[in-house]
C-alpha cells in the first residue's frame, strides 16, 4: 500500500520517516510522494582513461570515476548520452516496515533526463541520501542545478516489519551514505568467487 499525503505527514510526525533537512510540505509534498532536491556532488566516468570497467576489480570501478562538486547557483551540464551519479540533498531514514521508491519527475523527464537506471528501491531500515543514476537520453545538453527538485520519493507499507532491515543486513554496501558512491559490485560474493577462477 502506497502512503498518501496524510499518511506521509503522520509518518514524519511519528518518526517512522525521517528526512533531514525537514521538508517544506507546501512545496515538496504531493498526493502520494515527497519531492527531493539535487545535491552538489556528482560522479562521472572518465571514458578517455579506461577502455572498460571490470566489476571483479574494485579499483577498476573507483579509478574510472571522478568526483565533481558544483557550488549552489552553478550548473552541472549533462551532455547528450552522459551518465552521472548524484545524490539528494535530503538524508532519509525509513522504519523497518516501510519501503521507499525513487521516481522521476515528469518535468525533468521531458528534458530527456532520467534519474534512475534500475535502482529505485530503498529497503526497510534504509538511512542515507538517495543516489541517482542520471542519464541524458536526449540529443541536447541539459543544465541541472544543485537544489532543484529532481525526483519524487514514495513510501509503501509492508505487511509486517522486516526481520533484517537494511541497516542490520550483513554486507550492506551503501548504508549511511551522504554523497554518491561508486558501485561496490566487486564486494559481492559471487564476483569474489569468480576472481578465484
From Swiss-Prot:
One of its GO terms (biological process) is nucleobase-containing small molecule interconversion. Residues 172-197 are annotated as: Disordered. Keywords: Hydrolase, Nucleotide metabolism, Nucleotide-binding. Pathway: Pyrimidine metabolism; dUMP biosynthesis; dUMP from dCTP (dUTP route): step 1/2. DCTP binds at residues 105-110, 166, 177. The active site is at residue 133. One of its GO terms (molecular function) is dCTP deaminase activity. PANTHER family: DCTP DEAMINASE. Belongs to the dCTP deaminase family. Catalyzes the deamination of dCTP to dUTP. NCBIfam families: dCTP_deam (TIGR02274). Homotrimer. This is dCTP deaminase. The lineage of its organism: Bacteria, Pseudomonadati, Thermomicrobiota, Thermomicrobia, Thermomicrobiales.
Amino acid at each position: 500500500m502506497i502512503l498518501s499525503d496524510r499518511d506521509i505527514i503522520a509518518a514524519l510526525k511519528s518518526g517512522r520517516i525521517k528526512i533531514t533537512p525537514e521538508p517544506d510540505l507546501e512545496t515538496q509534498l504531493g498526493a502520494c510522494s515527497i519531492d527531493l532536491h539535487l545535491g552538489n556532488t556528482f560522479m562521472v566516468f572518465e571514458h578517455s582513461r579506461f577502455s572498460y570497467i571490470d566489476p571483479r576489480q574494485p579499483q577498476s570501478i573507483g579509478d574510472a570515476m571522478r568526483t565533481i562538486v558544483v557550488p549552489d547557483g552553478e550548473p552541472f551540464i549533462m551532455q547528450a548520452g552522459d551518465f552521472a551519479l548524484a545524490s539528494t540533498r535530503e538524508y532519509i531514514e525509513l522504519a523497518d516496515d516501510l519501503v521507499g521508491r525513487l521516481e522521476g519527475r515528469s518535468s525533468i523527464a521531458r528534458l530527456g533526463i532520467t534519474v534512475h537506471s534500475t535502482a529505485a528501491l530503498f529497503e526497510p531500515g534504509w538511512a542515507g541520501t538517495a543516489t541517482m543514476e542520471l542519464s541524458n537520453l536526449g540529443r541536447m545538453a541539459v543544465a541541472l542545478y544543485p537544489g532543484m527538485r529532481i525526483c519524487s520519493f514514495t513510501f509503501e507499507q509492508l505487511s509486517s516489519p522486516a526481520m533484517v532491515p537494511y541497516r542490520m543486513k550483513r554486507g550492506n554496501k551503501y548504508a549511511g551514505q551522504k554523497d554518491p558512491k561508486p558501485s561496490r559490485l566487486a564486494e559481492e560474493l559471487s564476483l569474489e568467487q569468480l576472481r578465484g577462477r
